[in-house]
Amino acid sequence: MTVEKSVVFKAEGEHFTDQKGNTIVGSGSGGTTKYFRIPAMCTTSKGTIVVFADARHNTASDQSFIDTAAARSTDGGKTWNKKIAIYNDRVNSKLSRVMDPTCIVANIQGRETILVMVGKWNNNDKTWGAYRDKAPDTDWDLVLYKSTDDGVTFSKVETNIHDIVTKNGTISAMLGGVGSGLQLNDGKLVFPVQMVRTKNITTVLNTSFIYSTDGITWSLPSGYCEGFGSENNIIEFNASLVNNIRNSGLRRSFETKDFGKTWTEFPPMDKKVDNRNHGVQGSTITIPSGNKLVAAHSSAQNKNNDYTRSDISLYAHNLYSGEVKLIDDFYPKVGNASGAGYSCLSYRKNVDKETLYVVYEANGSIEFQDLSRHLPVIKSYN
């Protein structure tokens, strides 16, 4: 039984414990965690829903004391078991942070695995674009955790991600695209990534992806999707990878037919959805419809044209004709300017059930909705 709507993480309503079992004292009422941001979600083959988010214990700020919280539901989003899945280093009580999760659920060598990737800092007190002197920045890291027990426990994966960024020589820091990655038809794992380039590179922010066959050894393509940056999602379509990117105003979309060496505009999705001033993260996935694919997308309409990022909505993209349809304004509210508008979609077709879920920011909380009722309309848009 799936609930239509529920609160996953409640602002000033959650208590967590640290690695030693001690209560983490936040600045929220009664010592609770103050604010939650940046939701990511995946649905497993068992129908389990796993949601990740920044647990911003003391303030909504990006530069603050942050852990990665995880919530797990086995009853379709009705109830949630919550904990900290990834702890920061506890080096700086004000600035140590792991943040901006991106997740994948995939079959890796015969075992269903959840991967979640987060950025890590300890001392930087400004936005990451302010640190472009070194490649990579010495305070930055990008870490990966996994679960092989349906989201019950998580452990760190020792990867070469930091090494490939160091070897590149032009990247100061790199983050996941935020939200979800994917497993390609050939089995490769793909995380969308956004990166800050060093000062000698004209464009500060670029996007791309990293890929792996085993979740341990990762590679970075030789090219970049340049000129547009910040949060992005990757989908697979007609032997290409398509990049959907946050932009101030109309969202941008580019495709690569040579696995990340070169990128060209992708007209069916490029400049189709307007997030207005400042832009906002969005979530883009594909849903099968017969022998075709439809892209489902969620992001804020941002009717006030500011950081309140109102009206988080669901869209369907016809990837062949380029038409786009607004399906549902599922959060028709004005957000909190301290942090608002982010969302993540998850589609799953299991033996007995087909689901479409969304999680999103709601005034410092993370909420869940079941959008499966829209699947017939979305699938007709092919």
Swiss-Prot record:
Pfam families: BNR_3 (PF13859)
EC class: hydrolase
Gene3D superfamilies in the cross-refs: 2.120.10.10
Annotated positions binding substrate: R37, R246, R309
Presence of the UniProt keyword Hydrolase in the record: yes
GO molecular function annotations of the record: exo-alpha-sialidase activity
Each BNR repeat, start to end: 71-82, 145-156, 210-220, 254-265
GO terms, biological process: ganglioside catabolic process; oligosaccharide catabolic process
Annotated catalysed reactions: Hydrolysis of alpha-(2->3)-, alpha-(2->6)-, alpha-(2->8)- glycosidic linkages of terminal sialic acid residues in oligosaccharides, glycoproteins, glycolipids, colominic acid and synthetic substrates
EC number(s) reported in the record: 3.2.1.18
Annotated keywords: Disulfide bond, Glycosidase, Hydrolase, Repeat
Gene Ontology cellular component terms for the protein in this record: cytoplasm; intracellular membrane-bounded organelle; membrane
Cystine connections: C42-C103
Superkingdom of origin organism: Bacteria
InterPro entries: Sialidase, Sialidase_fam, Sialidase_sf, Sialidase_trypan
Active-site residue list: D62 (proton acceptor), Y342 (nucleophile), E361
Role according to the record: Cleaves the terminal sialic acid (N-acetyl neuraminic acid) from carbohydrate chains in glycoproteins providing free sialic acid which can be used as carbon and energy sources. Sialidases have been suggested to be pathogenic factors in microbial infections.
Quaternary state and interactors: Monomer.
Family recorded in the similarity comment: Belongs to the glycosyl hydrolase 33 family.
PANTHER family: EXO-ALPHA-SIALIDASE (PTHR10628:SF30), SIALIDASE (PTHR10628)
Name under which the protein is recorded: Sialidase
Species name: Salmonella typhimurium (strain LT2 / SGSC1412 / ATCC 700720)
Gene expressing this chain: nanH
